[in-house]
Amino acid sequence: VLSAADKNNVKGAWEKVGTHAGEYGAEALERMFLSFPTTKTYFPHFDLTHGSAQVKAHGQKVGAALTKAVGHLDDLPNALSDLSDLHAHKLRVDPVNFKLLSHCLLVTLSRHLPEQEFTPAVHASLDKFFSNVSTVLTSKYR
């Protein structure tokens, strides 16, 4: 559960992400594909080379979903219900992959947000947020 301080930290960090959400989403995906090559199996039809249009487009989707989630911190299950259905029933993504992407998102944000703004407290709040999003996205697997 996100505390009031966590919610403020997440919203504050995401304000700084702003229009870069899709770009950072794509960078995190590339990082995930390089660091955890088994994740590529869910994208057999994608060109996974650096800067590919398909990875950029999917990064935009990731960024948009996270932006939506930030706007609905008190109701993530309803806000992400459609994505939960998609990933559980149609795409059948192994739940561990959400943890891998979450890690790559944290690394990406740590690279782009200024050090004085990506504090340990903000890092912890974003980690909790990504964990909550992952939990919601895997909730319909059960």
From Swiss-Prot:
Q: Which UniProt keywords apply?
A: Acetylation, Heme, Iron, Metal-binding, Oxygen transport, Phosphoprotein, Transport
Q: List the disulfide bonds.
A: none
Q: What domain of life does the native source organism fall in?
A: Eukaryota
Q: Extract one GO BP annotation from the record.
A: hydrogen peroxide catabolic process
Q: N6-succinyllysine is carried by which residues?
A: 7, 11, 16, 40
Give residues where Phosphoserine occurs. Answer: 3, 35, 102, 125, 139
Annotated Globin domain ranges read: 1-142
Q: Which residues carry this modification: N6-acetyllysine?
A: 16
Q: Phosphotyrosine occurs at which residues? A: 24
Q: Which positions does the record annotate as the modified residue Phosphothreonine?
A: 108, 135, 138
MF terms in GO: haptoglobin binding; heme binding; iron ion binding; organic acid binding; oxygen binding; oxygen carrier activity; peroxidase activity
Family matches, as Pfam families: Globin
**What is the tissue specificity?**
Red blood cells.
Q: Its GO CC terms?
A: blood microparticle; haptoglobin-hemoglobin complex; hemoglobin complex
Q: Which residues form the signal peptide?
A: none
Q: Does the keyword Iron apply?
A: yes
Q: How does it assemble?
A: Heterotetramer of two alpha chains and two beta chains.
The Swiss-Prot or TrEMBL record describes its family as follows: Belongs to the globin family.
Its function, per the record, reads: Involved in oxygen transport from the lung to the various peripheral tissues.
Q: What is this protein called?
A: Hemoglobin subunit alpha
According to its UniProt entry, this protein's organism is Procavia capensis habessinica (Abyssinian hyrax)
Coding gene?
Answer: HBA
